[in-house]
């Protein structure tokens, strides 16, 4: 009798769809400069699931750890090459395209998937504070220790604090979930 109950329950569990991730915000279009020195238009990310972070190359605090973790995201999502990664600098005065290119190479980035962006300081600050809704100090963007998950319609679908246990596993799970939701 117990077998008769368990088999239908297992079949039902296999059909249950995961709960959709919430929509936490909407990003507007932006134009910045990539580590290649070429213009980067956010529209190139449209239709792609992507993960963002804010770092700077001379940081001796959490940035190297975050970039290493972003490399793990790159590795753990290698089977889905449509997933993009975007690292924004919070120190554009120092982090020129050549500096970002050297930093990217150090973290073994895949140039087809992982972009390092710089640009106008006011624009980057506005994007971090008002676009991504990351906390700043005194109205300016200080690097956050959170990753941000964005869907192909530029909607923010998750925040992941790097100091929380299991954040990377949850982030990669949610990336894969958004990939499965794509039309």
Annotated model-derived regions:
Residues 2-8:
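Sec-dependent signal peptide recognition
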Residues 30-50, 74:
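A short beta-strand-turn-helix
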Residues 42-70:
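Short active-site neighborhood of thiol/selenol oxidoreductases, capturing the structured segment around
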Residues 16-18:
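Bacterial signal peptide processing site
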Residues 67-127:
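Structural microenvironment flanking redox-active thiols in thiol-disulfide oxidoreductases
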Residues 138-183:
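Thiol-/selenol-based redox modules, centered on thioredoxin-like
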Residues 11-14:
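C-terminal motif of bacterial Sec signal peptides marking the signal peptidase cleavage site
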Residues 27-28, 50, 144-146:
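Short loop/turn microsegments at loop-to-beta-strand junctions
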